[in-house]
């Protein structure tokens, strides 16, 4: 049996209008769609009559192994992420699983990364033009990165005067990281530094608030 293919698909911000044509094509030709339950819902209209595998938020590696297993069985698989799959998405973990399994580019399962608009781009478009010059992204999730490392990155970015996009600012169990990030930033930035708080960009529950670093 011939090997299949894995598409690592970035869906963009979430609305079908902002999904790339290549992302649609990848999903259309796929036998199997794998993703976090919330992301599966975003493409519900595009995946009828396909095998759909839904996984929870902390089951990233399970998704990767499922994709590899089916591709080795000859299936075409779309492993989906919101935004861009290479920016806090599934591309990195998938390549780790592939390499650990002995996979090499051009040998066996074919892999294609399908880029999408990441949150830094989508959110910026909704609030004006904050990324005209140098910018950086920092995730506040310490699930895979130690918090002291994240703190050092925040401080370095603040000292360097980057425009900063903070991903994963808080969750139900993780509420203090954003407070600590604010404390660090205030050591190097003015209290009146503008802040845009964007949630669910381009989705039905989109919410945008403007504040300052001191009051965010």
What are these regions (language model features)?
Residues 67-73, 125-129, 150-154, 208-215:
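Short, surface-exposed amphipathic charged segments that create phosphate/polyanion-binding patches used
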Residues 6-8, 159-216:
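A contiguous loop/helix-start segment that scaffolds small-molecule binding in enzyme catalytic cores
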Residues 1-111:
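Class I S-adenosyl-L-methionine
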Residues 22-26, 49-50, 94-97, 128, ...:
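Short, solvent-exposed amphipathic alpha-helical segments in soluble enzyme
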